[in-house]
Amino acid sequence: MFRSIVVGTDGSDTATQAVRQAVGLARAVGANLELVSAYEPVPEQRLAEERRSAPSDAQWAIGPREDVDATLEAAAAIAREEGVEVELCPRQGDPADAILDVAEERDVDLIVVGNKGMTGAKRFLLGSVPNKVSHHAPCSVLIIRTT
């Protein structure tokens, strides 16, 4: 059936529901689980400005990559609670492309995504993820309907 499953997450409630469904399915069929989340790089100019204005011993603010690492760790905790081993796959760039790239590279059998993205300005961008994934996936796609 399914040997390897990819699930995309952005830390939203919808994505967390997709993670929970993917974890349950992976546990039921004994599949490997790959958790994918995308981040945007911090522009070099902004990094240089922050370095000039910050005291030398200051802690750097959490950046986009660190946010994704935390998102993936939170999703991994859900899987580990259920005894499912996971691989964390942070990727730079578009969320749908990140999911599709991992699915193709790892030759997975199933992609799991939520049907909605985050609210506000990000909703438009993230709402297109399930659509793009379902049209370009190299494998089956399970879109989790959420409220």
Where are these regions (language model features)?
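Structural beta-alpha unit
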Residues: 1, 14, 28, 74-111
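Small/aliphatic-rich secondary-structure junction motif
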Residues: 3-55, 82-89
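Short secondary-structure boundary segments
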Residues: 37, 114-116, 146
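Generic structural signal for helix capping and beta-alpha/helix-loop junctions
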Residues: 42-43, 96-98, 120
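Short, hinge-like loop/turn segments at secondary-structure boundaries
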Residues: 50-54, 105-107, 129-130
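A short acidic, glycine-rich active-site loop
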Residues: 54-70
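Glycine-rich, Arg-bearing micro-motifs that act as flexible, cationic patches
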Residues: 110-135
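Short, conserved catalytic or interaction motifs in soluble domains
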Residues: 123, 138, 146
